[in-house]
Amino acid sequence: MVLNILLAIVGLIVGLGLGFVIAKSRHDKAINGAKISASSILENARKESETLKKEALLEAKEENQKYRSEIESELKESRLELKSQENRLIQREQTLDRKDDSLEKREGSLEEKEEKLGARQQLIDEREKEVENLINQQHQELERIASLSKEEAKSIIMKSTEEELNHELTLMVKESEQRAKEESDRKAKNLLSLAIQRCAADSVSETTVSVVTLPNDEMKGRIIGREGRNIRTLETLTGIDLIIDDTPEAVVLSGFDPIRREIARMTLEKLIQDGRIHPARIEEMVEKSRKEMDERIREYGEQAAFEVGAHTLHPDLIKILGRLRFRTSYGQNVLNHSIEVAKLAGVLAAELGEDVQLAKRAGLLHDIGKALDHEIEGSHVEIGAELAAKYKENSVVINAIASHHGDVEATSVISVLVAAADALSAARPGARSESLENYIRRLENLENISNSFEGVDSSFAVQAGREVRVMVKPEEISDLESVRLVRDIRKKIEDDLDYPGHIKVTVIRETRAVDYAK
């Protein structure tokens, strides 16, 4: 047992020794391998460092060479730029030298001129003194000869100069007015002639009577009735006078209201056709005729509105418009006149680029007040403007109605066009006529207005009152004053007279020289 233990211990010791020897041998081999590897690594590192060192030296040399080339190039460019600047400075110095020489020469010339101007100014001052002395001597001599002071002579010269300037100014104004008038007349004639060519209207004559044809003369007695009951009833209900005379188979209806006269005519024709004529039947027929008349008036208004393209008129305004069919002004039917004015205003508005439909509407309604002027207090212009405002018409239409006779200032081009179309429609030949009494009174007023001015010798109304010729006294009225006189007469006629169309005023100045040979 002990032996086994000893053997085990000996074996352990031997094993440990062998293990140590083997481990030491391996350790030595590892150390030698590491030394060899380290030597190899050091050698490789030395070689690589030498290679990197050489490459770095080469790169440094290349960079140095490149930098040196760039520096040399920049230096070369700087030298060239400096050389160029030096050349420019040399040229500028040369230019400045030349300018300096020129300025020196100019200064010398200016000094020389200054000396000459000084001498000339001195000479001028001396001559001015001489002239002033001569003028004073002449003034003294003139005052002695003319027995006038300097202020009196100055006043005479100023007055003469003022008269001469006024004369020239009047001539210039006259020439300017003539040129403007000729140009405006030419343009207006072209525009109005175009409008007239595109518009045609009927002419009618004013009448205050209507004639009803009878089938026979026996019907006259039936119309009169027993003790005149029928004729009195008809006259009372219609307000129209029935004239029954010796005219065969005819009865005359007389009255100044065309609507009532038309109702009476319609009633009488119905009674004649029916054959039953008595007061009750007359009342029935008058009422029926009035209803038919209201319908006809509405149709006339609608037809007029349709003809000019006014499609949105108020129904009440259409009825009032239709009443114009039975109104006349100086013999011209007012509804036809309104339609004509609407068409003319539309043509003029189209030529000037204005609203054609609005111009037609304003032209159609411009005399709407005449339908009610005998029922409502006020002028037809005021009534028409109030009606247009009441029925919410456009402000341009209201102003056109209010301003077409010049009572209110026109605020739009359409208002002016409506006034022009109204004057054109009224003034065309044959459009209007007037009674003999009014005609004679107008001629007398024309002559009286012309004769009221100082310097007028006589005046004559000619061309049916469309022209007044004024003869002036040549010793009191000069040619230039006659121009002012004709304007004054025209203004007074416009302010004092009411007339259709326009009136031409002609002032005639005549100077006669008479002598006798013996």
UniProtKB/Swiss-Prot annotation:
Main location: membrane
Gene Ontology terms, MF aspect: RNA binding; RNA endonuclease activity
Residue ranges of the region described as Disordered: 91-119
Transmembrane intervals: 2-22
Membrane topology: Single-pass membrane protein
InterPro entries: HD/PDEase_dom, HD_domain, HDIG_dom, KH_dom, KH_dom_type_1, KH_dom_type_1_sf, Ribonuclease_Y, RNase_Y_N
Entry's EC annotation: 3.1.-.-
GO cellular component terms, A-Z: plasma membrane
CDD domains found in the cross-reference section: HDc, KH-I_RNaseY
The HD domain, residue ranges: 334-427
Keywords: Cell membrane, Endonuclease, Hydrolase, Membrane, Nuclease, RNA-binding, Transmembrane, Transmembrane helix
A single BP term in Gene Ontology: mRNA catabolic process
Keyword presence, RNA-binding: yes
Compartments where located: Cell membrane
Name of the top EC class for this enzyme: hydrolase
Domain KH: 208-268
Keyword Nuclease belongs to the record: yes
Family: Belongs to the RNase Y family.
Entry function: Endoribonuclease that initiates mRNA decay.
PANTHER family, per the entry: RIBONUCLEASE Y
Name of the protein in its database record: Ribonuclease Y
Lineage of the organism: Bacteria, Bacillati, Bacillota, Bacilli, Lactobacillales
